[in-house]
Structure formats: structure tokens, C-alpha cells
């Protein structure tokens, strides 16, 4: 089968460092076009392409015949990868779906749960006839370490406790900080939403079915003046089984942590991107497995392309999964705004 013609929508840091290399790495896709806000940024992205010599450029300032709608009108482009600012992305997703293009859109699925629900409803209604697929790019669902840990967890019984700790400092010299839509966020949670959905997705490898979250109480704070509206959160999460755990995340802390620790009836697992440690019921380490660290983006793009070729969506990229990731964080934000008032989860899987 011939490679699928694809366009990259957006030319920011992630498109340069992750999406473009991922598209060029798989034989299942061929890059046909790039769209960006400015022609210069589209040119910058195209200039680093290694295996895509004939890429057409589109932008909002390129004039007649080179707008987003013109890209979507092309028959040789069947799919688009969209990586735009959180508030801007939904309208570009809707336009692509309306045009019958398969979509892989960066997380979060939308700025908030209400907008995400509307987007999913739009997709289901609009694409009944054209069959366009809608997938969300959550690369933490494609990291080998978390996949391995989740598979091992199946043999350990139900979850009894968990502790997620992701602590870091987004200082004002960080290149991601200097993207304007992140510096002055017009969406809930700021960096704690932008990054937080990654960490909720990783936690949800283990928190599913009877172990899915059912309620949360949280406190939130803005510690660093340059990270509005908040940069730190501490949440106690209750599961449907009645078990409880802690979800702790800060992008404004001088503490460093990046681990998902989960206790089960028959043992425990500590998962990190480069290592998984499995212990028995009395705490003895029974296995330590190392992994080469990967962002997971090349894996997720390849999985998406394979799903398009087969005509069967990859469940890991389902919009409903991304909706659950978003709800997990949004309820924490709402609880924090209400001084720790309990919030009920309704969309966990």
C-alpha cells in the first residue's frame, strides 16, 4: 500500500523536534505540506526536513491559494497532524474533520472538558458520512516503560495505594516558557494542564476499571510569580474500589521527582521513563528493568499511521482517553479553587 499523504499543522518546537522526525521515520507516511501562522515559521520547519524534498507551504500570510482551507482541499493529503496552541486547536481540528481528513491532534484534546465533549460530538456527527478518524497524540501512552509496567500490574491484583510525584522547575529561561501562549496562558491550569495531562495519562495506565478514579480533593498554588495561574498541586484521589492515592505535581519547585509508584495486593511497581522496579508483597525487589528513554512520539505517529492503513483506530489514541486525562486534571483544579472541596469524576474509563 502506498504511503499516506500527511500535512503538519503548526511549526513550533514540538513539530520541529518530534513530529517532523516521526513522520520521516515511518514508511507509512509521506509529508506533503506544512501549515503555520507565518510563512517564515513554515519555511523554518521545512528547512530541517531530511527525507521530504517536495513539501508545499501554507500559512495565514501566504496569500490566495495558500490558506489552511486550500491545504485541506487537496486530494493527495488524507491526514493531518495538528500541534497548535491549546485554545486555537479545536477550530483547526473541526475544519480538518469537516474536510474528511484523518486527524492526529496534540494533547490536551481541548482547553476544558466542556469544549472536549463538544469536539467529540462534532466529530461523531460530522464524520458519519466521510469516515474521518480523530485521534489524540498522548505520547506517554506509548512509552515502553509504562506499557511494560501496566502489563506486569495485571498479575498483582487490585490497586491498594498509589503515589505519583512529578516535581520540576519551569524557569523563565526555558524555551517552552517563551512560547507566548504558555507565558500568558488563557486556559485553566497553565503549565499544570499542558504537562499535567501527560502525567494523568501515565497514572491511568494503572487506574482503570474498578481502580479508576472516582473522587478527588486537592489544594493548588502559584509558587513562582512567572507561572500563572498555578504551578503546584497536591491531590488525594479516591478510586472506585475505595482505595486512595496521592497525585503531586509542580512545575515551580526546586525539588526533583518523576515517578509513578503503585501498590497492589501482591506487590508494587515503581515506574519511571527509563526504569521499572517490581517488588513482592513484603517489599523485596523481584525485578528491575531498564529502558532507553524515548519521548514516545515516533511510536505514537507510527501507530497512528498503521491504524490508518488497517482502517482500525488505535484505542490508546481514542478521544475518550484524552477526555479522561483532561477530566482528571480539571477536577483537581476545581477542587483547588474551592479550597479542597471534593469533586466527583464522571468520565474515567
Regions found by a protein language model. Give the residues of each.
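Short, conserved SAM-binding/catalytic segment
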Residues: 45-55, 119-126
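C-terminal helix-rich "cap/oligomerization" subdomain common to oxidoreductases
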Residues: 50, 79-81, 124-129, 240, ...
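Active-site loop of classical SDR/Rossmann-like NAD(P)-dependent oxidoreductases
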Residues: 14, 37, 290-302, 317-320
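Contiguous beta-strand/loop segments that form the cofactor/metal-binding neighborhood of enzyme cores
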Residues: 199-275, 301-313, 331-332, 346-349
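N-terminal Rossmann-like dinucleotide-binding module
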Residues: 1-52
Amino acid at each position: 500500500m502506498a504511503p499516506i499523504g500527511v500535512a503538519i499543522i503548526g511549526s513550533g518546537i514540538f513539530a520541529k523536534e518530534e513530529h517532523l522526525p516521526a513522520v520521516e521515520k515511518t514508511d507509512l507516511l509521506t509529508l506533503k505540506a506544512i501549515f503555520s501562522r507565518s510563512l517564515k515559521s513554515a519555511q523554518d520547519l521545512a528547512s530541517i526536513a531530511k527525507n521530504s524534498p517536495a513539501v508545499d507551504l501554507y500559512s495565514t500570510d501566504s496569500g490566495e491559494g495558500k490558506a489552511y482551507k486550500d491545504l485541506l482541499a487537496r486530494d493527495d493529503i488524507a491526514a493531518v497532524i495538528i500541534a497548535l496552541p491549546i485554545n486555537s486547536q479545536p477550530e483547526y481540528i473541526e475544519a480538518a474533520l469537516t474536510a474528511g481528513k484523518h486527524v492526529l491532534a496534540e494533547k490536551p484534546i481541548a482547553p476544558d472538558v466542556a469544549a472536549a465533549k463538544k469536539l467529540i460530538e462534532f466529530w461523531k456527527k460530522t464524520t458519519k458520512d466521510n469516515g474521518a478518524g480523530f485521534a489524540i497524540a498522548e505520547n506517554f501512552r506509548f512509552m515502553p516503560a509504562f506499557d511494560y509496567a501496566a502489563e506486569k500490574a495485571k498479575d498483582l491484583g487490585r490497586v491498594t495505594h498509589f503515589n505519583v510525584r512529578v516535581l520540576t522547575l519551569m524557569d523563565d529561561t526555558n524555551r517552552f516558557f517563551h512560547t507566548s501562549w504558555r507565558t500568558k496562558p488563557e486556559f485553566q491550569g497553565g503549565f499544570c494542564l499542558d504537562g499535567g495531562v501527560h502525567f494523568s495519562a501515565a497514572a491511568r495506565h494503572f487506574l482503570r476499571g474498578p481502580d479508576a478514579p472516582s473522587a478527588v480533593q486537592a489544594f493548588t498554588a502559584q509558587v513562582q510569580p512567572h507561572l500563572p495561574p498555578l504551578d503546584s498541586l497536591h491531590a488525594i484521589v479516591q478510586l472506585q474500589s475505595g482505595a486512595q492515592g496521592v497525585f503531586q505535581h509542580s512545575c515551580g519547585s526546586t525539588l526533583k521527582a518523576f515517578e509513578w509508584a503503585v501498590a497492589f495486593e501482591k506487590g508494587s511497581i515503581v515506574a519511571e521513563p527509563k526504569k521499572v522496579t517490581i517488588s513482592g508483597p513484603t517489599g523485596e525487589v523481584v525485578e528491575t528493568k531498564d529502558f532507553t528513554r524515548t519521548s514516545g512520539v515516533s511510536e505514537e505517529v507510527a501507530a497512528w499511521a498503521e491504524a490508518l492503513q488497517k482502517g482500525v483506530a488505535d484505542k490508546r489514541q481514542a478521544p475518550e482517553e484524552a477526555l479522561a486525562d483532561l477530566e482528571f486534571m480539571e477536577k483537581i483544579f476545581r477542587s483547588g479553587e474551592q479550597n479542597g472541596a471534593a469533586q466527583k469524576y464522571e468520565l474515567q474509563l
